[in-house]
Amino acid sequence: MLSLKSRGSWNVLRWIQVPRRTAVIPAKPSPMRRKRRRIKNVSSKDLDLRGIDPQDSRALEFKVKQLQEFTRNLKEQFKLADSNTKKLEAEEELAKSIPEDDDKRADELFGKLEAPAFEKPLPQPNLSTLILSAENQQLKKLIPVEIKERINDDGFLLARLIDKDNQNWNDIISKLYTTEKRLSDISMPIISSGILRKVKNLSYENIEKLDIMLLETKNGDITCFNRLMYETLLLNLSNLRPPTSGEEDKVTMKMRQLLERYDKSKEISPDVPSKMTQFSLNCCLKYSTKSVSFENMEYFLSKFKNDYGITPNRENYTTVIQFYVKFGVSKQAWDVFDTMKFLSSSHAPDVTTYNSVLHLCNRERDYAKAIDLYEEMLDRQLQPSIQTLNIMAKTMARASADNVISEGKADSLRLLGWKYIHTLESTFDHTKHETHFYHTLEAMMALAAYDGDVGFARALYYKYTTRKYKEVVKYWKGKFDSQKIWQTALDPQLFNLLLLAYANFRPNKLPILLGYEKGIKLRRNILNSVDYAGRYDLDDEIKVQLPMLPISDMNQAWQILAESRALWQFNLEFGGYYDLRDTPEGFDTTRLQEMVSKSATQDELQFNILHQVSQWKFQLVNHSILNPKSLTTFLTIPIKNGDRIEFMLRLKEFTFQQNDLESRIEKLYKGLKLVESRVEPNSHERDLAINQIEMDENVKWFASMKHKIVAKNYIYELMMKAASAFKDSAISKDAWQSRGEYRKTKLFQQMDSKRRIESDTQFAALMVQFFARQNMLTDALAIVMSTRKFIDWKYHMVKGLHEGLVKLEDEKSISILLDIVNKKSSIELLDEKIRDFQL
């Protein structure tokens, strides 16, 4: 959680401690320091105490030292005497056993007796020997000796295994595969403990090599392929990334191949115990979830249940639910969840399972269901996790956005969301759970954004972004790359929530947090902990500043518009690294003419231009920020704050019409091709001069596409909302005509028919709403009547029109409208006839 202390004692979530350093400075040598006296050559006469004053401590101390020195000398003399005695005894014994005339042999013996006094010490191992010995001991723990001998490269093995968190088994398996014997003649216990239980993160190619080597150990007998072998291969397969669209899914094919191998082994030896386990099933389900393959999920579930008698356990069921949630199949997810609750206690949902279905509630904005599940967890004595509380807070925030879904209780839902945040704050220590910090921050920003609490949302965004930037810079390695650093620090999800807070800002609305004591304290501490001017960061080595107004809170619409525009540019430009208005380097009229000349057809020219624009977007614009979701929120800000001019400027600068692109390319292509075909030189020069202005304009227009998004249905719907808000018929007319042109393009025609009908329905409803607000009731009713065969009109879509007709007491029009709204489908009419017939 965020720290709630005041500015003076506030600390960031991650502590950066600088240890104190001490220095020891030796004292300056003093000329007055008395030198220590060394006592030498002490005799027995020196030990005489006569003439010594008993009160003189220095004299007595000196005599004690003389006595110690005399005693030490005596000990050395005794040792020397003992040594000489031993030498004499050895000499006499040698003289008795060896002839006296063998002087040479005697000298050698006496030399050996003398040798111990001058013998050199035993040779000590050098540093290289110690390192090699340590490496051998370490390798014995990391890999079996038999496999080490096969590879025969200790340095290679140690370099790839010494870091237990990042072991490189791919290189080891590849090198082992190139050896002569591979895994042959190595006992199964050694292979199991040294390879199968340790190998991880293998590539697909190395999984195939490992499979071949394991089969070789069994001489190709698939009946001897044991359980651990299957589990190891399936586990490494499940950790691989699914292929991109259009590529062959080799991983799923390999998984199915392993199951088919096991089926064949069962046919050969039906009495062998089952080698398929819950673990194997979970590996298959894990990969199916990542690949988002409904077909594979159903195949593995039915295969393990029908052929192997393995029904999913709690972990398997949770994986299946997570898959259904990710796939968007809510009904199946709820069915599996309900099934788990009615099975044995070992299958009962745990906190992870509840979190999975809570994600579904958040997506569907079903706050009532989420609250019921949370209370159910408490009744079953399951401790909600940090993730649980974060999801609950987000669900309350999202549900409060729609007045219909929230049933008019938007403020109550946000207040309940803050309750979950306070529970999280009091229950968990954020320093021990910092990995969940981002999700908690996201939940808090969501609550503030939907409440329109700009001050709190921008403070959280500033704190997170500046902290993230400093962390990235601090641990950055290699050449400093400002673009990549800012791309990492600028989070698109949090930025969209900040834009949403700007859009929902109302100067006369009191934030929810200011309605109770805990909220007041939290909001005050967060706002006071932020210094937008950077005055308190002067001593910080890493400087960072965001283009935000140096005020803690906002109360004017112009402040919202100015800051949102500045932050939008800042995010798109990688923190100001590029300028959006600059033309990309190397792109001018000559380059554009060259592209036209090299294009054989108009479609080829369009493809080449769009390809160039996509490269610019990737290189020069922060494309993670420039997306339809953020753009919609960005365009909504001036609508909610009542600034028509700003809305039109933003719309023109960051969107383009598909038909404008096609018509411009067509004119450019035909115009230049026509000029190239001219024969008369004077006419040719005149046409080039005339087209130079158009070419310059085309260069600017195509260059600006790098920071623009093509206008689709959501843009036209937003234009209609703006027309209603500003009561501007010109905007509505422009939206109507532009969308009409858009419906003729391939982009719209290639859409699914269901989506086309949905978009037409939504746009028509907005048109009716606009005309009703403008009191153009006849035009609104005409739209409803002309589209009744294609659009299923509901009352909430024509509510404004109906209320306007009621005020005018136009009974005929009201009757026509209600007949259209209350009309029944052919299926409903058929059901009524069947019921009448039964009666």
Swiss-Prot record:
It is found in: Mitochondrion. PPR repeats lie at residues 313-347, 350-384. Its main location: mitochondrion. One of its GO terms (cellular component) is mitochondrion. The keyword DNA repair does not apply. InterPro entries: Pentatricopeptide_rpt, TPR-like_helical_dom_sf. Gene3D superfamilies: Tetratricopeptide repeat domain. PANTHER family: OS03G0856100 PROTEIN, PENTATRICOPEPTIDE REPEAT-CONTAINING PROTEIN. Regulates mitochondrial small subunit maturation by controlling 15S rRNA 5'-end processing. Localizes to the 5' precursor of the 15S rRNA in a position that is subsequently occupied by mS47 in the mature yeast mtSSU. Uses structure and sequence-specific RNA recognition, binding to a single-stranded region of the precursor and specifically recognizing bases -6 to -1. The exchange of Ccm1 for mS47 is coupled to the irreversible removal of precursor rRNA that is accompanied by conformational changes of the mitoribosomal proteins uS5m and mS26. Belongs to the CCM1 family. NCBIfam families: PPR. Involved in mitochondrial-nuclear incompatibility, a major determinant in reproductive isolation between species, through hybrid incompatibility of Ccm1 and its interacting partner 15S rRNA between yeast species. This is Mitochondrial 15S rRNA processing factor CCM1. It comes from Zygosaccharomyces rouxii (strain ATCC 2623 / CBS 732 / NBRC 1130 / NCYC 568 / NRRL Y-229).
